[in-house]
């Protein structure tokens, strides 16, 4: 719930809490009956509760329209991003009207708006006061969120018509939208997609308007008395607050909005997949059916999306990981990857790379325990806020937990003896194994796991050192991401309303971060009030070759842990001999597992030589060349590179083809000619024939490529 002030409608979120996804429904509940196929929309039955819900809505809408008749027209001023001020009328002029006054083309291209830089607003909803107004097209973050949220309502209406179950939540996501429904023993299957799409398309063609009302809590409870999931959400709203509802066609839903003006804006709609889920993400709660979808303002974008998804499927790290024998998962240890020899090579290389940079950049590597008493987590504050995500074990009549993060342990290390200002900045780095109790349904390959390692570091420094340390962190991050070929964006998140600490300290810290970002010289965005309660932060989003955004690196200031652990250092200030340090939380790879998944998909499994688990393979023409081939393989291996040999009886063309499919960087063919010249015939996985090279020259080339991270 966002806005709970008296006399203001509660902007009820469509998604109250993430709902854990489980196995695909068709796999988990094969024996349960699928929905009866009805073929066309006209044969579908409208549930009785829908009729009652609409009757209540129409009554409330009539009262609302009647109340507007007595409302006096009051002028308002609407300020656009370019500074232009447009006159409007309170509770009458809409963002669409403002856009239409500029040009009809602009009006037809926007799907959402933002009022006063914060609240996303329907373009068909009248403005209520003087404001700053930003008009948002589909390609903006606000535009996509609004567009896909509206599409979720279309999906929800279609599911009500087809299945007649109880809708739960239906949010927009970063990749489209979904809706959950309680359906008893019924399940959704891939065979249903065609019918869902047909019904959704009919809803689009009907050009159903999205209408909004703010109603008293008691009326909302009456309207949704048939749906225990909606009433559970409503019951959490304070009695004196109003509830925001939206209607399109036969669907009335709890929703904070905003939405597009009508369903015809959704030009292209498709169901993409389905699964089962738990209500409120808890395994002890009811089973739900989840249907995912995607939509766009035109069919061309849908075609581009489908092409993108085909390419993404080819690069999916789970498929590549299996094909290249890098890792696997087992139900005996959900969310914990088994890294096979070739996957371990990549994993270790990433860690070694960061470790070498630590040595160059003044970080001190430490090793901390994996299990701590509950008392530590109570002192750090994590027990109160994070215990449900921790693995807790009873030990010696006390509760212990596997650590989900390293920072409290590093605080104990800093506080283990008296510290001097001469030791600062003190940079602790830790590759310790972390465990977080993620919901089973949320586990996804290497990107969402329970056991992982981070390139985690905590910098203990003075307030005066913040700017230089942040600059150093940004430079470190830029160097690493440059090697991987990632573009990145920066965002500064400042003091939230629930901040802890002194405002003066926050002001100094935020100014230091801003100076560091400006000095760094890359564009950055401001996210007001989006920092953590314990300090401001810089969020870094990388972009892969498919233009997908991932957040891996974090740079976070922390004023609270030094207070909680009573950390001090001996200062050189005679007026204040003891001072508290500031902590900078810093990671670049983030989770090594997640970064490995991103790199697999970024490279498509075609690893650059420096990090490749299969750098070279010697391929013999026939068995008479095997002895020389083994000699070459050993020389390359002894030089520190991964080299295999295929001295089987297969044909040379088949050996080469299999080596290319296995993504060996270099394929070294040896026959009698190579034996005579003490050389190898070099070709690449992309079938580029390089010709003959001596083994020493080849090893020198390998060393240079590794040195250049190629």
Swiss-Prot record:
Residues 1-35 are annotated as: Disordered. GO terms for biological process: threonyl-tRNA aminoacylation. The gene is thrS1. This is Probable threonine--tRNA ligase 1, cytoplasmic. Keywords: Aminoacyl-tRNA synthetase, ATP-binding, Cytoplasm, Ligase, Nucleotide-binding, Protein biosynthesis. Its EC number is 6.1.1.3. The lineage of its organism: Eukaryota, Amoebozoa, Evosea, Eumycetozoa, Dictyostelia. One of its GO terms (molecular function) is threonine-tRNA ligase activity. Belongs to the class-II aminoacyl-tRNA synthetase family.
């Amino acid at each position: 719930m966002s806005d709970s002030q008296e006399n203001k409608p509660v902007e009820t979120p469509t998604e109250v809490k993430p709902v854990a996804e489980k196995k695909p429904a068709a796999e988990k509940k094969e024996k349960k009956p699928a929905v009866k196929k009805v073929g066309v929309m006209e044969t579908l039955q409208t549930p009785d509760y829908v009729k009652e819900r609409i009757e209540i809505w129409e009554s409330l809408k009539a009262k609302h329209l009647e109340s507007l008749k007595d409302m006096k027209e009051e002028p308002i001023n609407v300020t656009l991003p370019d500074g232009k001020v447009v006159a409007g009328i309170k509770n009458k002029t809409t963002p669409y009207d403002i856009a239409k006054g500029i040009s009809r083309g602009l009006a037809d291209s926007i799907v959402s708006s933002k009022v006063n830089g914060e609240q996303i607003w329907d373009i068909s909803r009248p403005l209520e006061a003087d404001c700053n107004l930003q008009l948002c097209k589909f390609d903006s973050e606000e535009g996509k969120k609004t567009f896909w949220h509206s599409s979720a309502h279309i999906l929800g209406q279609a599911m009500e018509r087809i299945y007649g179950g109880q809708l739960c939540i239906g949010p927009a996501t970063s990749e489209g939208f979904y809706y959950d429904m309680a359906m008893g023993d019924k399940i959704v299957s891939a065979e249903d997609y065609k019918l869902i799409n047909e019904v959704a398309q009919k809803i689009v063609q009907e050009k159903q308007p999205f209408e909004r009302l703010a109603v008293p809590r008691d009326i909302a409870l009456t309207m949704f008395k048939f749906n225990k999931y909606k009433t559970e959400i409503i019951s959490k709203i304070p009695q004196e607050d109003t509830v925001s509802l939206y209607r399109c066609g036969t669907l009335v839903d709890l929703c904070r909005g905003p939405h597009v003006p009508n369903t015809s804006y959704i030009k292209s709609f498709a169901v993409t997949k389905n699964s089962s889920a738990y209500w409120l993400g808890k395994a002890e709660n009811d089973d739900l059916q989840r249907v995912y979808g995607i939509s766009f303002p035109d069919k061309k974008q849908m075609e581009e999306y489908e092409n993108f998804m085909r390419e993404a499927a080819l690069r999916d790290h789970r498929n590549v990981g299996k094909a290249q024998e890098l890792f696997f998962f087992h139900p005996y240890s959900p969310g914990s990857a088994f890294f096979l020899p070739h996957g371990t090579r990549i994993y270790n290389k990433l860690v070694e790379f960061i470790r070498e940079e630590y040595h160059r950049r003044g970080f001190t590597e430490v090793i901390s325990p994996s299990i701590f008493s509950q008392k530590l987590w109570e002192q750090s504050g994590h027990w109160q806020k994070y215990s449900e995500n921790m693995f807790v074990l009873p030990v010696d009549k006390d509760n212990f937990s596997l650590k989900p993060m390293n920072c409290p342990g590093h605080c104990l290390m800093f506080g283990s003896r008296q510290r001097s200002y001469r030791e600062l900045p003190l940079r602790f780095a830790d590759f310790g194994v972390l465990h977080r109790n993620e919901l089973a349904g949320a586990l996804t390959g290497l990107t969402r796991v329970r056991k992982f390692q981070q390139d985690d570091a905590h910098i203990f420094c003075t307030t005066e050192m913040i700017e230089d340390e942040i600059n150093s962190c940004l430079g470190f991050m830029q160097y690493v991401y440059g090697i991987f070929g990632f573009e990145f964006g920066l965002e500064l998140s400042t003091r939230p309303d629930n901040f802890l600490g002194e405002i003066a300290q926050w002001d100094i810290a935020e100014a230091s971060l801003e100076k560091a970002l400006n000095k760094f010289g890359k564009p950055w965005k401001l996210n007001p009030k989006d920092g953590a309660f314990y300090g401001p932060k810089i969020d870094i989003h990388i972009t892969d070759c498919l233009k997908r955004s991932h957040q891996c690196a974090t740079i976070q200031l922390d004023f609270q842990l030094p207070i909680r652990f009573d950390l001090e250092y001996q200062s050189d200030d005679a007026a204040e001999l003891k001072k508290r340090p500031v902590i900078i939380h810093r990671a670049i790879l983030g989770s090594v597992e997640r970064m490995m998944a991103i790199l697999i998909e970024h490279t498509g499994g075609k690893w650059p030589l420096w990090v490749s688990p299969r750098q070279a393979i010697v391929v013999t023409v026939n068995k008479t060349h095997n002895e020389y081939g083994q000699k070459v393989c050993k020389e390359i291996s002894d030089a520190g590179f991964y080299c295999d040999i295929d001295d089987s009886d297969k044909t040379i063309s088949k050996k080469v083809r299999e080596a290319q499919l296995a993504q060996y960087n270099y394929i070294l063919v040896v026959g009698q000619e190579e034996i005579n010249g003490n050389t190898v015939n070099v070709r690449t996985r992309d079938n580029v024939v390089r010709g003959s090279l001596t083994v020493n020259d080849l090893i020198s080339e390998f060393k240079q490529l590794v040195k250049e991270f190629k």
